[in-house]
Amino acid sequence: MQNRYRGTAITACFVVGVVLFLTVGQALGQSSTYQAERTTDGKPNLNGIWQTMNTANWDLQDHPAYPGLPIGGAIGAVPPGQGVVVGNDIPYQDWAMEQKDKNFTNRLTEDPEAKCYLPGVPRATYMPYPFQIIQGTEKMLIAYGYAEAVRTVHLDKENPEPAPIDSWMGRSHGTWDGETLVVEVAGFNGEAWLDRAGNFHGSGLRVTERYTPISPNALMYEATLEDPDVYTRPWTIKMPLYRRLEENARLIEYKCIEFSEELLYGHLRKESGQ
């Protein structure tokens, strides 16, 4: 009797495995040949509200779970996650690696996110909040759920214009490469971090983003970062973006409160002498 059940279980597992293999294969095949719905000017339609499902905002690289402020308990803990860096290596110069380590040590107070500054690019894309793409023929607006950040992608200029001033979000210029929107971003102020683990860049950063539809409700997002003052070579992050499918999905007004953990729990920390 036990052997009969064991044989049935093995057969069931084999069948499930075959089905999953075929399903994954079909999905990968669709992603490489998928053609998105078109806008009135014949371009892939990227309109919608999108969001990542990863832990990149905590740390772009592979990372275990670790605690935050002791008084915050599980609420402030960092979830474990798989990295989104291709090859899992950020090629810092020696001095920059030392700075990154210092940033990590002081992350609870020095991360610009804790101070409600704009997140920069590409970080705005993978923060744990949705963002909306509003696509036009000459301009594209990307509105982010965090801190009401916005940026304009200029599609109407063959030669990118330099940013008039350095800023948190830089200046974005987009072109189409078949099914992929390619966005070149430069003109940063060098103050933003890339995640809560202290990964960072300088004012010489240039980002090349690629938005590629892979199904009706998913985009593949890639961003290549170049900054010869900080990194030894260009490097790339890659992750899927998912469409928010809730009825009447929309961005909700976000009011950022600086150092909210300190405001809520700081008096307890001081009372305990920490």
Regions from the language model: what does each represent?
Residues 2-274:
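PEST-like low-complexity, intrinsically disordered acidic/proline/serine-rich tracts
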